């Protein structure tokens, strides 16, 4: 080009000229990681979700972008898809499932999940969002989902995703005993609980109800029976309140000593999933025994005396008392 017109409106082919290099600076937003954990019912679960910055820093031709550690990670409820603010204790609770806590660990984020005592199954989980030093967040969508699919399938973006699963515990029974005097009725309530303890070191009770009643186990067949009245020859009659598991024992008048007792069985769900449903694998069975002891009654007599003048009839009643 030798004149202004050729420079402004070039046509044809130039056989000579200058070429200038131009360095294009490309920036990319950061992305998170998908993490899953599995733990037993009531136990705390933990994980670390990694975050990766991509591309170059906006104001540098030599420095790579990094996760901005001065910007706190953000928690998002996967059910509501809304950013949430944890409570004063740092936890955010999802009703019917459990509570979450996130803590920045350099560029990554530590996650803690404490399930509710009666929650089992896969939780909705949470999403975690971070920001890089270019001001970009992980809340972005790939234009080519085949080549670069979303990391977070819940929000359909690149936020970090954490999903915990809680497996059901077994059910265990606790035997009960009682003692009373000969002829007196006695009661005892065998109890049922999840094996072990929850994250606070407490036993979690499972009680009978209308849908899952307690039942006697036949002492002869060893099988569960539907009859709430059980007679044991030579001992007495046992009555079961199937909605509470309480057993009432009415001994035979002449029975003393420790009875053979009865076994109570409970088949019930140890928890429910995030939709409040009971899955077949959540239903467990345990047995517990109730054993009454009857102490023999003794009869003690009290002599009586009377006094009056000659030829006047006198009366008095000696007394007899039962005691153990």
Predicted regions and their residues:
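Sparse, context-dependent recognition of short Cys/His-centered cofactor- or disulfide-binding micro-motifs
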Residues: 7-9, 175, 240
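Intrinsically disordered, low-complexity boundary segments flanking structured domains
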Residues: 8-12, 86-88, 149, 201
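A broad "non-catalytic interaction surface" signal
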Residues: 1-29, 51-63
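Acidic, turn/loop-rich segments in luminal/extracellular domains of secretory-pathway
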Residues: 1, 88-158, 224-286
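Solvent-exposed loop and beta-edge segments used for protein-protein assembly and interaction
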Residues: 16-18, 41-43, 105-107, 120-122, ...
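Extracellular interdomain linkers/hinges and stalk-like, low-complexity segments
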Residues: 27-66, 131-207, 265-324
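Surface-exposed or secretory-pathway low-complexity segments enriched in glycine-proline
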Residues: 44-110, 114, 185-244, 286-290, ...
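Short amphipathic alpha-helical surface micro-motifs
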Residues: 4-8, 230-231, 299-301
């Amino acid at each position: 080009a030798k004149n202004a017109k050729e420079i402004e409106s070039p046509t044809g082919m130039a056989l000579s000229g200058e070429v200038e290099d131009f360095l294009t600076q490309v920036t990319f937003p950061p992305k998170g990681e998908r993490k899953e954990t599995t733990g037993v019912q009531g136990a705390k679960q933990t994980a670390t979700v990694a975050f990766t910055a991509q591309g170059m820093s906006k104001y540098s031709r030599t420095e790579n972008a990094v996760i901005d550690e001065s910007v706190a990670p953000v928690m998002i409820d996967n059910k509501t898809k809304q950013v949430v603010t944890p409570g004063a204790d740092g936890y955010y609770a999802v009703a019917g499932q459990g509570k979450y806590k996130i803590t920045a660990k350099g560029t990554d984020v530590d996650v803690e999940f404490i399930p509710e005592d009666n929650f089992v199954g896969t939780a909705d989980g949470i999403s975690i969002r971070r920001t890089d030093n270019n001001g970009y967040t992980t809340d972005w969508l790939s234009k080519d989902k085949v080549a670069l699919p979303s990391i977070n399938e819940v929000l359909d973006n690149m936020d970090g995703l954490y999903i915990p699963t809680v497996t059901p515990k077994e059910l265990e029974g606790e035997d009960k005993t009682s003692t009373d005097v000969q002829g007196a009725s006695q009661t005892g309530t065998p109890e049922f609980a999840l094996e072990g303890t929850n994250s606070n070191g407490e036993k979690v009770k499972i009680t009978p109800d209308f849908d899952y009643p307690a039942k006697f186990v036949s002492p002869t067949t060893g099988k569960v029976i539907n009859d709430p009245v059980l007679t044991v020859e030579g001992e007495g009659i046992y009555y079961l309140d199937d909605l509470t598991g309480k057993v009432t024992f009415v001994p035979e008048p002449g029975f003393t000593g420790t009875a053979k007792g009865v076994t109570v069985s409970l088949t019930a769900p140890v928890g429910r999933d995030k939709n409040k449903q009971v899955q077949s694998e959540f239903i467990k069975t345990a047995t517990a025994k109730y054993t009454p002891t009857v102490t023999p009654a003794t009869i003690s007599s009290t002599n009586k005396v009377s006094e009056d003048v000659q030829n006047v009839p006198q009366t008095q009643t000696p007394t007899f008392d039962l005691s153990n």
